[in-house]
Amino acid sequence: MSKSDQLFEQARQTIPGGVNSPVRAFNGVGGTPRFIDHADGAYLYDVDGQAYVDYIGSWGPMLLGHNHPAIKAAVIKAVEKGLSYGAPTEIEVLMAEKVRQIVPSMEQVRMVNSGTEATMSAIRLARGYTGRDKIVKFEGCYHGHADSLLVKAGSGALTLGQPNSPGVPADFAKHTLTCVFNDLDSVREAFTQYGCDIACIIVEPVAGNMNCIPPVPGFLEGLRTICDEFGALLILDEVMTGFRVSLRGAQGYYNIDPDLTTLGKIIGAGMPVGAFGGKKKVMQHIAPTGPVYQAGTLSGNPVAMAAGLTMLDLLLEPGLYEQLNAKTARVAEGLKAAAAKHGIPLAINYVGGMFGFFFTDEPEITRYEQVTRCDMERFKRFYHLMLEEGVYLAPSAYEAGFLSLAHGDKEIEHTLAAAERSFAKLAG
C-alpha cells in the first residue's frame, strides 16, 4: 500500500470524503488521490516520491510555476513582520493600486479571502446597487458555493432555478435564472420576461468548469449590450482567467468592459485570497461608504498581499504572455496530433494559458451539453495512463488544464511523449 493510500484512508476518518474540496477525491476518475509533499517549478512531488508535470497549478494561479524564489522571499519577509493585524496596511493599498493599473475597469477594489467570497459579494453589491433581486448565470459555469449560485436550470427554458445541492432553500434559488453559455437568444429571452427584475449577469468569460470553453464571437459583446439595455450590471468572474489569458485577463483579451470583476487566488500567487472591484459609482455602495454590507477579518492579509504584489510585478515583464500562449498551443496541438495518429477522436480548446480536451467526434465544443456527451470512460482511462507516466492532469472531464511559464521544452516533450504512448494504449 502506498503512502497516499494510507493517508487517504486515514483522512477519511476525520475529513468528509478524505479531502477538503470534492474534486480532489478522484470521484471523477476513480482510484486514490495523490497526496502532495511539495512542489517546484512545473512539478508536483507526492508523498511516495513520484514527480509529476503539473497541469493544474492549484487550479490556475501558479502562472509562474511553483515555489518561485522572488515570491517565496516576499512571503518570508512579510511573515517576519507578522501574520495578521486586523487593521489597514500599506501593502493592501499598493496591491489595489497595482490591480487598478493593470485592469482599468476595476476603478476601486475590495480584497476578500476567496473566489467564492468575491462572487458572493459582487452579486450582493449588484443587487444593492440596482434594487433588484434576480441574477442570470450560465449552465455549467461555477462561481463558488454561495447559495444563490448552486442552482441549475428548471425543466423548461425559462423556469426559475432549482437548487442543485441540499441545503439551498428554493426561495433563494428562485431568484437565479440559468441560461445557456454561448447562446445569446436564451439570455435575451430571460431578459424579455424578467428584465426589470434582473440585477446582473455573472459569467466566466472563458468557461473553465465545463472543461475549457471560450466565448463564441459576439457572445460577451452581446451580454454587455443586453445589460446596458436593461440597466443590469455585467460581472465577469475572472477567478480563473484573471491575469492568465492575458495581463488584463479575459476582459483585455476580448476587449470587454464589465461593471464588476471578481478575482481569486491568482492575486495572491496561490495564497487564499480574492478580490472584487469595478466602476467607482458601483463600488461606492459597499460599506463603509455605502449601505451594502461586506466585511472580512482576514481581508487584505499582509502575507497574501506581499505574494500577490510580487507576482503582479513579475507579470509586467514584456513577452511573458507570448511565451505562455506558445507553450499552451504546443501542448494542445500536440495532444490533438497524437490522438489523431492513433485514430482517437479528440477536440481541443485553448486560450491563453488554459486548455481543455474532449473525447468526442464533434469537431468544435462550444456548449455545456456537448461536454456531457463526451466519452467519460475513455477520459478516465487516459487520465490514469498519464498519471502513471508522471503527468498530473485535472481529475475531472469538466475541469480546465493550466500551463505555467515554468513549463519548458523538457516538460512539454515529456507530456507529449506520454500522451503518444497513452493514446496508443487506448487504441489497442
Swiss-Prot record:
GO biological processes: protoporphyrinogen IX biosynthetic process
Main subcellular localisation: cytoplasm
Reaction catalysis annotation: (S)-4-amino-5-oxopentanoate = 5-aminolevulinate
SUPFAM superfamilies: PLP-dependent transferases (SSF53383)
Subcellular location(s) per record: Cytoplasm
First-level EC class: isomerase
Range of residues in the leader sequence: none
UniProt name for this protein: Glutamate-1-semialdehyde 2,1-aminomutase
Organism of provenance: Aeromonas salmonicida (strain A449)
Gene this chain is encoded by: hemL
